[in-house]
Amino acid sequence: MADFKLTYATMFNPPEELHTGFDKAVEALKKNMGKEYGMFINGKEVLADEKFDDTSPVNTSWVLAKMQKGNASHATQAIAAARKAFPEWSHTPWQKRVEYLRKAASLIEQRIFELGAAMALEVGKNRMESLGDVQETADLIYYSCYQMEKNDGYVVEMGKDPLVGYEARNVSVLRPYGV
């Protein structure tokens, strides 16, 4: 599968390894159905008092996972954590942020079968659409990274001031906005 690139145009004739990998991932996922998962707030797993069952539209008797029912306090904690992290992230050079995002995209690609199987069971998409969506997610991140590099971090020189006798340097700079 090394030379096969999954796209919406190629999904109609994929190599057999794509089906085999997906089938194995579905079986592994089914073995863990019903497991409880916490929320992640400020880098820590947080459990809520209330839970809910995440069921599959493929078979509504399948409980895929027991999830946390977050409340306003959890949302406030998550927003506070994001605000706390923002200054460091916004001062991280764009090249380093691109490096982190490329690593995230690579991890998504490495876990394409696991993520695709989870999407198929949770959303009810067929295997090729779910695998295609996972690959498209990685590709979108790669594209954003490419655009950042192509545009030098989106530091773009703007037009000269047209007024006679005035000299101004106008620059457009893309920066993280915050929480």
What is the predicted role of each segment?
Residues 39, 149, 174:
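Short glycine- and Lys/Arg-enriched binding-loop motifs that mark or flank ligand-binding interfaces
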